[in-house]
Amino acid sequence: MPRSPFPVLVTSVNQRYLEQTKHQDIPGILLQLDFQRAFDTIEWKFIQNVIAFFNVGESIQQWISTFYSNIQSSVLNNGFSTNYFALSRGVRQGCPLSPFLFVLAVELLACKIRQDKEIQGIKIFRKELKISQFADDTILLNNNRNSVGRALNVLDNFGNLSGLRLNSSKTKALWLGPWRHCKETPFGFQWPEKPERILASYVSYDVKQNEKLNFETKLQKMQSIFDVWNCRNLTIFGWCLIAKSLGIAQLVHTISILNISKAYIRTVNSTIFKFIWKNEKDKIKRRVMISDCDEGGLRAPSIEIMVKSMKLAWDP
């Protein structure tokens, strides 16, 4: 099953806005929201109202109501179970329906923030961005403090209705553009000076540090995978397959978001072909290796082609 492109798009858009606020000298504040036990606290009554609001169909509403009505649970501890007690909040872990119900619920928050004229996002290339979401990961972009205050009021009201509460002490914030050197730490949030992770990728103004943090860890993981397979006895086709399916796959998400320098491209290529040729000198030219089999090649992975294809596929 192919992975969803949405985490790639969310992180890519945030990184793009981060870079443009610096280049165009646009002030702003980025908030990485943290909800307290998000999937465990959302109210069932709120979910039912959301389903009715989006009009998903009477049949689906009835099925969901059946799954989330008059539910009781018991806790098993050291072989002893407690009395049954009623449940009225939270979506079930492991249930394939749970992510969709949660996403529908938090979509109301996104709609409210986008429609509120007092909440001003960051406008770049005539496009204003206020909020980006993936599951319970929510990023807010504001261009002034008053806008942040208004957004927090909306979050409080949403929490009163839905049960989702903002954890201010774990919410992280970042000054953007000309404010990036500001030392103030308002609103009770964390204001880290080091690069922060958003959806498994580091995001920061320092391009070199950003590249180092994101790519070096992936390269180390790729090398560790190759080390495990080095003791196997495979054909040249097998080595190429492992390099492509297990090794270079480690870089897909990061390459989709960030630009990779020529130095790292050379490092990746060197690592791949050293693995294929068992640390010996290349016996076949690499341009031949990456060609299709009907052209005399082995379809070995090409990091250059991968970079171009990923940028073409995911560039928002």
Task: Annotate the PLM regions.
Residues 1-108, 272:
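Conserved pre-catalytic core of RNA-dependent polymerases
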Residues 79, 166-195:
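Short, conserved micro-motifs composed of acidic
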Residues 10-22, 50, 147-162, 219-224:
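Inter-domain linker/hinge segments that demarcate the starts of reverse transcriptase
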Residues 38-54, 132-160, 177-178, 207:
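Catalytic palm subdomain of template-directed nucleic-acid polymerases
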Residues 72-86, 218-225, 278-286:
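Active-site-adjacent bridging/hinge elements
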